Amino acid sequence: MASLFSSRLGSQSLSLLINIFFIFLIFLHFASQTPPPSGSIQTLNSFAGGDSDSCSGGLASLDDHRSKCSYIRSQSKCGPQGYIDYLKIFFCIFGQSPVLGHLVLSAWLFVLFYLLGDTAASYFCPSLDSLSKVLKLSPTMAGVTLLSLGNGAPDLFSSVVSFTRSNNGDFGLNSILGGAFFVSSFVVGTICVLIGSRDVAIDRNSFIRDVVFLLVALCCLGLIIFIGKVTIWVALCYLSIYLLYVGFLSVSHFFDRKKRMSDQILRSREDLAEMGVSLLGYIAEEKLALPEKTTQEFKIVFEDSPKRHRSCFSVLVSIIGLPLYLPRRLTIPVVCEEKWSKPCAVVSTAIAPVLLTELYCSHYSGSQRNLILYIISGSIGLIVGILAYLTTEKSHPPKKFSLVWLLGGFTMSVTWTYMIAQELVSLLISLGNIFGISPSVLGLTVLAWGNSLGDLIANVTVAFHGGNDGAQIALSGCYAGPLFNTVIGLGVPLVISSLAEYPGVYIIPSDNSLLETLGFLMVGLLWALVIMPKKKMRLDKLVGGGLLAIYLCFLSLRLARVFGVLDTDR
């Protein structure tokens, strides 16, 4: 109990630091909104090359922070892609202390990654889990649809934002491919090296199925990138690859289940890996079968802890934590038993329409039109809030219209995930302008690593401690997850972007390094696909060492180009 309490204090300390920093950054945001010095705009435009295509090009030609501050205030191309103007904060507030500015923006990057993961874990995934139960989806179908959507939400929305909001499609392409490469090569390689001496084998059919589907998706994507343009029909065809995967998986699961019933043998959970059952379906079944004892024990530990533990420090943490917790809690309807609160539910239903309107108006300007939308959304929110107050109880979540409540929670959790992803992409683009690094490189590395860190920790832990079943779950996740992100995470933005250009075509951003990334990624997949069967599907150190070498070789090549060590014509 002491360790649990100390870990709780540790998490409270982390929450305290994050929220203090959040408040501090809001102050910096408003402090940076002062007008530029008069009489300097025309001179700076002439000196910095006001007609240059990129903001970083103009900034690179300026020396002192004051001229850079005035320049970014005068150039629309240096405007923020999100809600906070990071370039103004860096050059206008921390211009004389760039090291401090770097630390502040790096810390905020960590906060955004935390918020993105916490929103998905605390609001998005519970909504999906409840929806799967209400819709009575089979474990396999829930696994490859809702569970995959929950796990891939950060990548999906970051990609959508980069294509639609920031007009940096190459950023989204690099982040998705970078994440897929990291998981399928670095994470798989790490797993193989760590458990290579344990003689652990995985199911051949499941492995080949997932890798082949991922290779097919990458080949189609490579063809699209090579052509350089995509129509709405091509984008829909690319998106349908995942539908084929789901259909193939469902048919396979149906015949496996029929075979088990005909044999009339009760299979133990240890035999599931040998039957080729999908990882995602297996995870879903595991979740459904978990005993409630563990959850109850944790509840007992925390609920029965003496109130003397509730010190002034914990109260202070709760108060300062409101800037991060309260906005989401008061706009996302939560209908699970553990977190049910009628006041919060009523307020969230009333405010949610206004937040959706704000998100829409932030994309489309027009004061008169926006005012009308705010009035309409406020009226709708008032009516829905009154209905929620009259039809809910304090003691338990609503039993009637549960699907409506769940859809509302799902919609608002999607909204928050999108908003945070938008801010994350905006910050990375600003960091690219500050350091003079292409945003696509940051998407390939920083964003891909940040979104895939959870996969690294979870899959390595499951494989290391779970024996054969754990290795099967981890390896399948390392291929099924990237397949979802590659097809859905890129297919959805391509459909949205090509639909906006219809009946024309959407032009894929020109970036030759994308084909290079695809090539290395496919080499890693082919290495595993060839070597694993030769090793009788055992997770051998040779497999892991080869995958790690491929990834590190690729990463070294890209970083050498970024820092000017290797200069090649591309």
Swiss-Prot record:
Q: Which GO cellular component terms, listed alphabetically, does the Swiss-Prot or TrEMBL entry include?
A: vacuolar membrane
Q: How does this chain sit within the bilayer?
A: Multi-pass membrane protein
Q: Where are the transmembrane segments?
A: 14-34, 97-117, 141-161, 176-196, 212-232, 235-255, 344-364, 371-391, 401-421, 427-447, 479-499, 513-533, 546-566
Protein's GO biological process = potassium ion transport; sodium ion transport
- Name the major location: membrane
Keywords of the record, alphabetical order, are: Antiport, Ion transport, Membrane, Potassium, Potassium transport, Sodium, Sodium transport, Transmembrane, Transmembrane helix, Transport, Vacuole
Q: Name one GO molecular function term.
A: antiporter activity
The record's annotation in Pfam families points to: Na_Ca_ex (PF01699)
Question: What does the UniProt entry say about where the protein is found?
Answer: Vacuole membrane
Q: What does the entry say induces or represses the expression of this protein?
A: By salt stress and drought stress.
Superkingdom, taxonomy of origin? Eukaryota
Tissues expressing the protein: Expressed in roots, leaves, stems and flowers.
Q: Which InterPro entries match?
A: CaCA_antiporter (IPR051359), NaCa_Exmemb (IPR004837), NCX_ion-bd_dom_sf (IPR044880)
Its biological purpose is as follows: Vacuolar membrane-localized H(+)-dependent K(+) and Na(+) transporter.
Task: Please report which protein family the annotation says this sequence is part of.
Answer: Belongs to the Ca(2+):cation antiporter (CaCA) (TC 2.A.19) family. Cation/calcium exchanger (CCX) subfamily.
Q: What's the protein here called? A: Cation/calcium exchanger 1
